[in-house]
């Protein structure tokens, strides 16, 4: 992994996780005597991912950790010396050795914010050479984190508020860094938990999981537990031989379900018993190792009823193949009738979890009204973001020495907005979002109830808006290398993301053909763009 530990034992990326041309440009700045000129870059995206109308910002905490720990080691400088021209002035490498972020300031959207095209996720200011070197690692830290958080938010919108979503994609992710990042930011985006224990240990993500088919198929049925006895949940009364009790319950279950007692797989039942002895208060069954109807379900019921007799309650079952929606419906019906038949009514409410390469289409089916599915495990389709594998974030220069800079290209979409800017969110009276406004930092902030002439991006004429509420978007998190505003916890950012999404209009939440959320420019910013464009950015 391209990580090292900071002074608090947390993982941070290393400075050389960057592109070579950052170092070659750095040498160019230094040779031109411009290394220490004050500059500002903005990190943003041009199009919302997945064909949607919004994105969620993520990765800010990782960026601040990276900046606070930034320092090139001797080995880093020696490597750069080996790939730069051999006649490079040694004083340049001494300059690199002395670099830190003590003159860097960062304004940013709070983590978990709604973000829209062109609005800066980060504004990074400091010495030109240094803030140029920061481009690639900051993009790396923000782009994928925001993409995964947005993907998770979309999946949460499809699932609705009541289904529990489990991220289980570590084994399918693009490497350990990708898996770790996905586990953190799918949680921020709205998932309930992750199977990734490292994300739980290092970042506090709630961890959850079931069991795999390998555990079940490893048992033949001839295994004898070293201690088959299980005490009641209340600790009152004698311990019971659990395997023997399960076998007795299996007779009743098979008669009730119309099965022969030899049909349920002996090894599967032994596996369930072993798991129940290890986790009597958290017993769950994976039902499809052999046959759900003829084996997994009756074996699970026998163990669950034996545990229930001792005062324990099974916590769930999982399905991993077949028609998940239909099977869940059938299983819920059996749980209901078996619970009533054997006076264990809690059985009706045992959660049913499903997994099996679930994508947006299948998730919508599993989340439909009347579905008996409670927990949905998603792996590949959350961590790999198959509908769009990259967020497309960019990091562009907007000012040097206090003078605005613009990039003019052959594609109007790729032109940049010059100058140091402020961003505001306009809301209507009921609290839903109206539009975002970008203006020059030197302009007075807009006020609620004030009529403003603004330019919607791409418009040929200005329009007038009158916001009921105005919220500033960018906050100062790092000032001259020192923390300014405390970073929220992951839990706080997750809650903020859900609150932010709740204020988005339904037309903007649509996952297919959504309404476009508008981002506008102030008249002064639009005039600056026109002026610099006409002059060719001279």
Curated annotation (Swiss-Prot):
The gene is Naprt. It is found in: Cytoplasm, Cytosol. Belongs to the NAPRTase family. It comes from the Eukaryota. The modification Phosphohistidine is found at residue 213. PANTHER family: NICOTINATE PHOSPHORIBOSYLTRANSFERASE. Transiently phosphorylated on a His residue during the reaction cycle. Phosphorylation strongly increases the affinity for substrates and increases the rate of nicotinate D-ribonucleotide production. Dephosphorylation regenerates the low-affinity form of the enzyme, leading to product release. The lineage of its organism: Eukaryota, Metazoa, Chordata, Craniata, Vertebrata. This is Nicotinate phosphoribosyltransferase. Coiled coil: none annotated. GO terms for biological process: NAD biosynthetic process; NAD biosynthetic process via the salvage pathway; response to oxidative stress. Keywords: Cytoplasm, Ligase, Magnesium, Manganese, Metal-binding, Phosphoprotein, Pyridine nucleotide biosynthesis, Transferase. One of its GO terms (cellular component) is cytosol.
